[in-house]
């Protein structure tokens, strides 16, 4: 652990020395609405592009148009890194359309990364591994991402790989190719920092069972180890936590436990979710109302939902009110979940549905969250009124 810390601090020292005089610009994080699944584009101040996950068979329908038409990206200039969080269909099947000359034509320039999955299937080969081997793809075949990898995003901004394939930076490793690891728990966890701004993106990573928040799951608790690693390395502050948290696994009860939330203390949460999800009931009330915020009489998110005027803080009653991390200031989701209820929970509709969600920050004064209102219509879900595009600004508050 001590050796690992020294190595990381040496890397960070060199990194800051090199980039201290870089030109200032915004960091952007785009949650592309692919429905039930995930695809997130990170654009650094220096223009470095990381595409994290590629959605289902939606590359040509959702991702490619977003990249070309909304962002005006030129395929021949490419995307620097393609990172697959884990090998589930709703995270990888769009890759083929993104890189194929027929649809996207985007070149991957520096690396195609995956967590080190042991999963093998014809579908995985067809939609991910084989397309990456095309002679037009400069980065070449997918390969396991190195734990602790640091990607320079420019002007002091960086992305660090804190977890991959069930292993966490600074923690004892799992056995290589351990097939007992749930594929979700192989998810790559990226920590992104730009001056005052901090953000965690971690696919479908699990937080394990927890009585306090009524989480029932077969997934392991990897998220709490990630949070502890960030604290141990001094990458986040124990009192202030992170600004924005990716609510992993589409808001499933497998992830985002109270123990994890208590350590990362986010201000804003974002859920990538959508219709046509079967009986998963994402996002779940036991995550939204037991961890992120409190239950409300109208079923909608209210910033003061946990105030005394609204009935007090009803989350995680195994902790005293004074010990609990503050509830979220805002909760966004890319689309509506499918309504339903089972013996283990039901769907939450508290999150503000925004379609594509764009985070922008200069790293110093504030960060903003913008939404397009672009939702996906399906007969299998509930749709409310049309959503206009909009934007909200958040000031950095290191004493919250």
Please state what every model-predicted region is:
Residues 1-9:
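Bacterial N-terminal signal peptides that target proteins for export
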Residues 10, 20-21:
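Cleavable N-terminal signal peptides
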Residues 23-28, 34, 74-76, 81, ...:
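Flexible, acidic/histidine-containing loops and adjacent segments that form or flank the divalent-metal
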Residues 34, 53-57, 87, 164-166, ...:
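Active-site metal-binding loops of divalent metal-dependent hydrolases
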Residues 39:
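N-terminal cofactor/phosphate-binding cores enriched in small/glycine residues
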């Amino acid at each position: 652990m001590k050796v690992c810390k020294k190595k990381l601090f040496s890397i960070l020292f060199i990194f800051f020395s090199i980039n201290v005089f870089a030109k200032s610009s915004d960091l952007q994080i785009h949650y592309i609405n692919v429905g039930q699944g995930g695809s997130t584009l990170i654009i650094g101040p220096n223009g470095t592009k990381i595409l994290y996950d590629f959605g289902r068979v939606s590359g040509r329908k959702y991702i490619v148009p977003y990249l070309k038409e909304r962002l005006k990206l030129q395929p021949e200039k490419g995307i620097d890194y393609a990172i697959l969080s884990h090998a589930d269909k709703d995270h990888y099947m769009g890759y083929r359309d993104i890189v194929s000359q027929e649809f996207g034509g985007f070149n991957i320039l520096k690396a195609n990364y995956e967590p080190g999955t042991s999963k093998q299937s014809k579908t995985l080969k067809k939609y991910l591994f084989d397309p990456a081997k095309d002679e037009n793809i400069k980065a070449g075949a997918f390969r396991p991402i190195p734990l602790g990898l640091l990607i320079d995003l420019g002007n002091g901004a960086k992305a660090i790989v804190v977890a991959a394939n069930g292993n966490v930076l600074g923690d004892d490793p799992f056995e290589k190719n351990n097939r007992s690891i749930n594929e979700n728990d192989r998810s790559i966890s990226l920590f992104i920092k730009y001056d005052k701004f901090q953000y965690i993106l971690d696919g479908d990573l699990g937080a394990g069972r927890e009585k306090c928040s009524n989480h029932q799951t077969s997934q392991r608790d990897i998220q709490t180890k990630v949070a502890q690693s960030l604290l141990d390395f001094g990458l986040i502050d124990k009192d202030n936590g992170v600004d924005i948290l990716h609510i992993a696994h589409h808001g499933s009860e497998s992830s985002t436990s109270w123990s994890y939330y208590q350590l990362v203390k986010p201000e804003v949460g974002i859920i990538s979710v959508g219709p046509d999800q079967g009986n998963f009931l994402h996002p779940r009330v036991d995550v939204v109302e037991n961890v992120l915020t409190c239950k409300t009489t109208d079923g909608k998110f209210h910033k003061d939902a946990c105030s005394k005027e609204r009935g007090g803080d009803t989350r995680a009653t195994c902790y005293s009110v004074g010990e609990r991390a503050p509830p979220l200031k805002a909760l966004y989701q890319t689309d509506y979940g499918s309504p339903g209820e089972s013996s283990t929970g039901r769907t939450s509709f508290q999150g503000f549905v925004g379609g594509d969600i764009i985070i922008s920050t200069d790293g110093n004064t504030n960060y903003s969250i913008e939404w397009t209102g672009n939702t996906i219509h399906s007969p299998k879900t509930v749709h409310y009124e049309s959503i206009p595009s909009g934007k909200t600004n958040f000031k950095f508050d290191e004493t919250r």
